[in-house]
Every structure is written in structure tokens, then in C-alpha cells.
Amino acid sequence: MLELNKDARAIVAAHADKALPVEGVPALNYSREDAVYRTAKQAALALGFIEIDAECVALAWQAQVQRTGRFDVQAWPDEPADFGLRPWPRDDAFPACPKSLGLYAVLPTALWVGRMARAGVPTVQLRFKSDDAAAVQREVQAAVDAVRGTQALLFINDHWREAIAAGAYGVHLGQEDMEIADFAAIRAAGLRLGLSSHGYAEMVRADALSPSYIAMGAVYPTTLKRMATAPQGPGRLAAYARLMRDYPGVAIGGIDASRFGEIRATGVGSLAVVRAITAEADPEQAAAHLMARWAA
């Protein structure tokens, strides 16, 4: 068991809603001598945050105490400046999208994109997986064509070059894509940019690019994609949403209608669904039900 000082134990007790199971005894690696930093690092690791996220929390807690002049175990850090985020407005920001993207359907083909756009889903994403460059180009163009005449906002997952060429509304990229994407070209083309995140360190990294929105998750267990981090849960999602309040936030991962109340309570304005639509016998009816539940 990780040895905690008294204040670290108090932080853990006060923020049990953010706790995830801890496997083994996490190593305590300190980058600073500051007592507040060390206390917060202990607490964050005990709550199950991975090392890089625990470091972010610890540094932010130290900055919070330096800024306010007081240490309060109840005051989980959520001030952007304490995490080193730049103030808004920003000259280098990507084009804005609606603060609430509503129901956000992640779909495998252009055919699905067209069906959900015509069903009134406000935001759709084409997540088309293929190693055939020509097939990708055709599918992206077909998705752009499929949303014409509807109010749906179309994001293209991964394929940013094809999204630019086809004139999509935006592109969504994962953290791994940030190493290779030409963000200057995406911005110059006027596309909106959505970025995935799975914890504090990745949110801070995403913020450096001033994207149009930030997706946060996975909130609940999902079988659709192998995740590097454990499901974050609604407690952490609420903390992430408070920190990233200047962005439209999108909750993703294992979400269905039964979870809407928990998601809404976090303050996140949008939620992404996959199987809650594509696995249903009547996807259009399922989409209508989900939109009505989210709006209720």
C-alpha cells in the first residue's frame, strides 16, 4: 500500500468520486521538493491516476496554493492557469463550433452518416477504417455529400487530408495522430478540429493546439477500442469538464441512454455514442430516443 501523509489521506477521502482501482504499489517519483506538490502527488496516485496525470494534478495543486495562499483538501484544482493553460481568446485557435454539439454519433460508413444526418442527429463523425487510400477518399467524399441539405455537422476521424480535399466541417484526431498531422494545413483550410483525451496530461497537450472541441473518455467500459487507460468515470469527467470549461466538451466511451443523467450532471454539453445507435434494430428510432432523452 502507498504510504500517505495526513493531508494526502484527507484529499483521498474528500475526492473518492475520482478514485479508480490501483494495481500494485505505484512508485513515488517527485520532481519537486514542495510539500504541497508531494502531498498532492501521493493523493493523486492513491486515487488511481496514472503517473503523468498525477504529476499534472500535483503541479496544479502547488500552483493553486501559491496563487490563493491557502491549502484546502476539498479544493481539487480546476483553474486553467494552474495547469499552465493559456488564457482566451487566442489568435491561433481553430475555428469555433457550437458550445453544445448535442448527440454526437460516431459511424463506420458514409451510408450510416447519411442516415443519421437525415434522422436529425446534430453531429456525426465518419470513422472509416481502411488501408486503401482510394477507398478512404471515396468514403470521405461520400460522407460530405451525404450531409448536404441537412443541419448535421460532419467530422472525419483520422483522415485529415481527405477531409480538407472534400470540404468537411471538421476533423477528429487521436493523441497518436498529433505527431503526424499538419495542423497548419487543417487550420488554413478552415476545418474545425476535435482532439481525443484520456486524462489530464493529454488534455493539457490538446489545449496547446487550441482545438475546436476536446473529447474526454473513455467514461465507461467499452469493447470498441482498446484503451491505454481505465474508464475514467463520471467523477473524473466532471473535474475534466470544469478545467476545460472554455471548450465544447464531448464525453465518449460506453455511453447509452441509461448514463445520460450522470453525464449531464458533469456539465459536459455533448456526448458521443456508437453502439447505442449502430447496434439497434431501428437506428433512426434509437437516435430519436437518445436525442429526446438528452434534451429532457
Predicted regions and their residues:
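Alpha-helix-loop-beta-strand connector modules within alpha/beta enzyme cores
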Residues: 137-158, 175-178, 182-199, 227-257, ...
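Acidic (Asp/Glu)-rich catalytic clusters
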Residues: 114-120, 144-149, 164-165, 184-188, ...
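Catalytic cores of alpha/beta
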Residues: 154-169, 198-212, 242-250, 255-273, ...
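Conserved small-residue-rich
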Residues: 97-152
